Curated annotation (Swiss-Prot):
Gene encoding the protein: Chil3
High-level lineage: Eukaryota, Metazoa, Chordata, Craniata, Vertebrata
Native organism: Mus musculus (Mouse)
Primary residence: secreted
Catalytic activity: Hydrolysis of terminal non-reducing N-acetyl-D-hexosamine residues in N-acetyl-beta-D-hexosaminides
Span of the signal peptide: 1-21
Function per UniProt: Lectin that binds saccharides with a free amino group, such as glucosamine or galactosamine. Binding to oligomeric saccharides is much stronger than binding to mono- or disaccharides. Also binds chitin and heparin. Has weak hexosaminidase activity but no chitinase activity. Has chemotactic activity for T-lymphocytes, bone marrow cells and eosinophils. May play a role in inflammation and allergy.
GO cellular component, one term: rough endoplasmic reticulum lumen
EC number in record: 3.2.1.52
The name this protein goes by in its record: Chitinase-like protein 3
Length: 398
């Protein structure tokens, strides 16, 4: 019995010392600080012990060089990277791109070797100047949305050249190499058009897969934002609109499992029902739901706004085939994630030997704990616990 206790104690000690093999990456969006008071979220609100990587969204591009979007971003950079004083194991990445940024600046930049080198060298200078540990390329998307087919190849060329430049800079200056990651699409047709997966997997440190935004009001019927599995009603291409199918596609087409980071949304998509008596998956809809009080975006509610919707009397339903919830009240309907679905997805992630999770975005979790009455950052904290994320040197505020 004494030997068993000793062995168990050593195992626990080793686990604490070695830490988790999983990554927990968290996006911070620069516009979160501009929300009304209770929803305003600044870099100083971030628990430095919560995530392994913090990703600042977004930088811009001018004349093929990376640049900040607003002058306030520079103060944010300092505050975000200052969190590393409290957690020496924390890494910070700067994301460039995003949906609103569009593909055009990327297409122009990758079009010639000279433009690519201008961009790559500007990235190295910029990241070092502002104390970031790496880059997140968020090109949405190579080969889609007006980006020409040749960009599929040129994106791989860019990534390969950037990785080489990062390695050379590291050797030349005898400093840790900058990390290189990319956001990856979650729609199969977009993946096919945009990515040479084996080549990207070889050059990138991680691929953060957008396993969310899989259904929205443009569909004309209700659907989950980020279902783990397909619905019995999913046929044709709809059968691929789930986390399991998307990640399987990336793996089956050449991505290393340990480099795949699964997207976890801290928000839901909202719909207006055509008929309030029809509330299930696939029910007909007429438009996006009204904007949330704090996020102020039609068709979307932050997790903490979903909690308010539930607290005000909405009916919550567990969608068992897809392992995620939805809720409705009157003619309003929302598909989202909660602590239960995050736990199930975290276990699935571990069962599939994947690299970790990425939360989009941290500022839509219930960071204050005052809306959902669970705890601070209930969704992200669930992932931290279930993926065994910890830093022995970090002392957080919660």
């Amino acid at each position: 019995m004494a030997k068993l206790i000793l062995v168990t104690g050593l195992a626990i000690l080793l686990n604490v010392q070695l830490g988790s093999s999983y990554q927990l990456m968290c996006y911070y969006t620069s516009w979160a600080k501009d929300r009304p008071i209770e929803g305003s979220f600044k870099p100083g609100n971030i628990d430095p012990c919560l995530c392994t990587h913090l990703i600042y969204a977004f930088a811009g591009m001018q004349n093929n060089e990376i640049t900040y979007t607003h002058e306030q971003d520079l103060r944010d950079y300092e505050a975000l990277n200052g969190l590393k004083d409290k957690n020496t194991e924390l890494k910070t990445l700067l994301a460039i791109g995003g949906w609103k940024f569009g593909p055009a600046p990327f297409s122009a930049m990758v079009s010639t070797p000279q433009n690519r080198q201008i961009f790559i060298q500007s990235v190295i200078r910029f990241l070092r100047q502002y104390n970031f540990d790496g880059l997140n390329l968020d090109w949405q998307y190579p080969g889609s949305r007006g980006s020409p087919p040749k960009d599929k190849h040129l994106f791989s060329v860019l990534v390969k050249e950037m990785r080489k430049a990062f390695e050379e800079e590291s050797v030349e200056k005898d400093i840790p190499r900058l990390l290189l990651t990319s956001t990856g699409a979650g729609i199969i047709d977009v993946i096919k058009s945009g990515y040479k997966i084996p080549e990207l997997s070889q050059s990138l440190d991680y691929i953060q897969v957008m396993t969310y935004d899989l259904h929205d009001p443009k569909d004309g019927y209700t659907g989950e934002n980020s279902p783990l599995y397909k619905s019995p009603y999913d046929i044709g291409k709809s059968a691929d609109l789930n986390v399991d199918s998307i990640i399987s596609y990336w793996k089956d087409h050449g991505a290393a499992s340990e480099k795949l980071i699964v997207g976890f949304p801290a928000y839901g998509h909202t719909f207006i029902l055509s008929d309030p008596s029809k509330t299930g998956i696939g029910a007909p809809t007429i438009s996006t739901g009204p904007p949330g009080k704090y996020t102020d975006e039609s068709g979307l509610l932050a997790y903490y706004e979903v909690c308010t919707f539930l607290n005000e009397g909405a009916t919550e339903v567990w969608d068992a085939p897809q392992e995620v919830p939805y809720a409705y009240q009157g003619n309003e309907w929302v598909g989202y994630d909660n602590v239960r679905s995050f736990k199930l997805k975290a276990q699935w992630l571990k069962d599939n030997n994947l690299g970790g999770a990425v939360v989009w975005p941290l500022d839509m979790d219930d960071f204050s704990g005052s809306f959902c009455h669970q705890r601070h950052f209930p969704l992200t904290s669930t992932l931290k616990g279930d993926l065994n994320i910890h830093s022995a040197s970090c002392k957080g505020p919660y």
